Regions:
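Internal alpha-helical scaffold of NAD(P)-dependent oxidoreductase catalytic cores
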Residues: 14-19, 37-139
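Exposed alpha-helical structural elements
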Residues: 10, 59, 81, 116, ...
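NAD(P)-dependent Rossmann-like dehydrogenase/reductase catalytic/cofactor-binding core
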Residues: 122-213
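Rossmann-like NAD(P)(H) cofactor-binding subdomain of soluble oxidoreductases
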Residues: 1-35
Length: 213
């Protein structure tokens, strides 16, 4: 239930003999003086039964159903998290390029109110997804997740601005995400891997040069 940029083999090495399953919530929030201010949707991503390798998968899904939680099973949970990280890197690096990460809420608000900046986000996400593809991920297996980023950037930017204006919970997730180290980890992980793999990413590169902690 967190962002990571590591391989499945590395995750298995961390876990050792511990029985686990990979999942990811549709959620966001922050801690202030032991108080959690957050948003939790009734939907999560869940590793498929064959790859999860746990004996009580049916019990887990029954539990989710009893709590009125819906789940979706991607082709591969690790790859899905990489894609999620890439999308985050495109969004947050664009937001942060124009200011200091000490005030991420203000940066998020400025971004959500500008269709031109959101259009740039789409282009940055496309570059970040090329990094994921360069790691060996077949993006065609994630068509549904990536469809919004195929739309012409100027149209997508306007649509995103309207979506953020109308969807209070999605907007709140953006403004509550204030862990600057997590934000920087996400951006830096994707960017460094792109450099190592020789991926051309001029927008991400310009964004990263503008970020200050």
């Amino acid at each position: 239930f967190c962002n990571f940029w590591d391989t499945r083999k590395e995750v298995e090495e961390w876990a050792g003999d511990y029985v686990y399953i990979l999942a990811f919530p549709t959620a966001g929030g922050q801690m202030q003086d032991d108080h959690l201010d957050g948003v939790l949707f009734d939907h999560l991503m869940l590793e498929g039964e064959q790859k999860a390798d746990i004996s009580n998968y049916a019990d887990l899904t029954d539990l989710l159903t009893s709590a009125d939680l819906k789940w979706e099973v991607p082709h591969d949970m690790v790859e899905w998290i990489w894609i999620h990280m890439a999308i985050n890197a495109g969004v947050t690096s664009t937001a942060a390029r124009s200011g200091n990460l000490e005030n991420p809420e203000e940066l998020a608000l400025n971004l959500m109110n500008s269709s031109s900046e959101l259009s740039l986000v789409i282009k940055a996400i496309r570059e970040a997804l090329k990094v994921v593809e360069a790691r060996g991920v077949n993006l065609k297996l994630y068509k549904a997740e990536l469809l919004p980023y195929k739309i012409p950037a100027w149209i997508a930017g306007k649509a995103m601005k309207i979506m953020f204006a109308k969807n209070e919970l999605t907007r709140k997730i953006m403004t509550l995400h204030n862990d600057k180290q997590d934000i920087f980890y996400c951006c830096q992980s994707v960017y460094q891997t792109g450099q190592e793999l020789g991926v051309k990413m001029p927008i991400l590169e310009a964004n990263m040069k503008g970020i200050s902690l």
